[in-house]
Amino acid sequence: MFCALCCGLLAQSARRTVCAMLVGARLSQTWSHHRAHRFFSHAKWSVDGLSAVLARLVVRTLVPIGDAVLVAIDDTLFARRGPKVFAASWFHDGSAPGEKKVGYGNNWVIAAIVVKLSFLDRPIALPVAFFLVRKGPDELSRLAAARRLVTMLSEALDGRRIDVVADAAYAGKVLRGLPASITWTTRLRSNAALYGLAPAPTGRRGRPRERGGRLASLSELAKQATFAPATVSRYSKTTAVEVAVIRCLWYGVFGRQEVLVVLVRDKAKTGYDIALVTTDLDVGPGGVVQRYAARWSIEVSIEDAKQTGGVGEARNRVQLAVERTVPFALIVNTLTVVWYATVGYHPHDVDERRELAPWYRDKAQPSVLDMFTKLRRVIVASYLRPVDPQPPTPQEITLLRLAWEDVEA
């Protein structure tokens, strides 16, 4: 059932509802649509278990041996309607039109493994773990959910080094006591209270101090800091910036754990443009800047998933179905990229795309849409290879023609 619906979602170029997956798999006249819906609402399978297997697959095939696994964290809203949709509520939605950036739907925290592919000049984020946010006093916050996902990935990868990167919303006391194999990098809030390192024990009676004196504000620290030039690769470009490094404590978030604060300025001659903080004390300031810049890849991945992969288009309402359909579609998105990176890529893919769409004069790399389109063509072509070779029916010819028209579009 999983393989059938997976292929059906990929083969379906229209709206990717559960019934549409069945149609895309060419099983709509063989299986009842209830069978497809029950796969999400009643069948015994675990999203977390599937996430663990997927994470191991991504790391084994796309992350070099010995390298740390870079994990980006973010949350997004999938719009829904109706009071009976499980866990649907009003949440912040940065993509919402107008001044009030709120929307109604299901809010998901997503953990994605960021990888570099030889045919792309930018990192790409592959979603592997997911958490549905529920409102309520006893429910996990987004930050607590993020830590839970990272801990789950660490266990699935047998304690392999994980470098987490997230925006400023993902910083709080819940991050205290992170395992040694997990580092956390985020943007430092402008009003963050920083403290000096704990002084050496005095030998006197009483509990030793856990922190030094409070440091000045970030703007004052920037005036006093010594900036040094650094060359960083970010957003598909190599740029020169100036950085200053401060070793201190962000006691309100990480407690007694020592952190590295990196002040970055691009064009400003005074002050700073952005402040970053990391628990990774071994990385250089340029590495911190590049790591945080790689966080943008999860934003792109979520947008591709919504616009290209059909994620969030299933109209489920009951708890298990709501908890499974979005992760299922995101998993299919990740599997598509893994397939393309391992066996699907060909250097002529871009040339073929430019021949079909000559107005893309500067296109030099395959997009996620190109990856989906190629896999869709492979799946559709497989439908036309029966065990007992027979001439294709008019319906099969139409199906293949529509697949190629989707490429040209």
Question: What is the predicted function of each stretch?
Answer:
Residues 1, 9, 117-118, 122-135, ...:
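A short, flexible helix-boundary coil/loop motif
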Residues 2-9, 270-296:
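Extended, non-catalytic structural segments that build the interaction scaffolds
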Residues 9, 13-83, 89-90, 151-152, ...:
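Electropositive nucleic-acid engagement tracts
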Residues 21, 36, 67-81, 111, ...:
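Short, conserved catalytic/metal-binding motifs centered on acidic residues
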Residues 29-38, 94-160, 252-275, 279:
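Electropositive, glycine- and tryptophan-enriched low-complexity nucleic-acid-binding patches
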Residues 41-123, 130, 233, 239, ...:
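Active-site-proximal, Lys/Arg-enriched surface segment
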Residues 77, 285-316:
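Short amphipathic alpha-helical "interface-anchor" segments enriched in bulky aromatics
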Residues 135-204:
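Domain-level cores of phosphate- or acyl-group-handling catalytic modules
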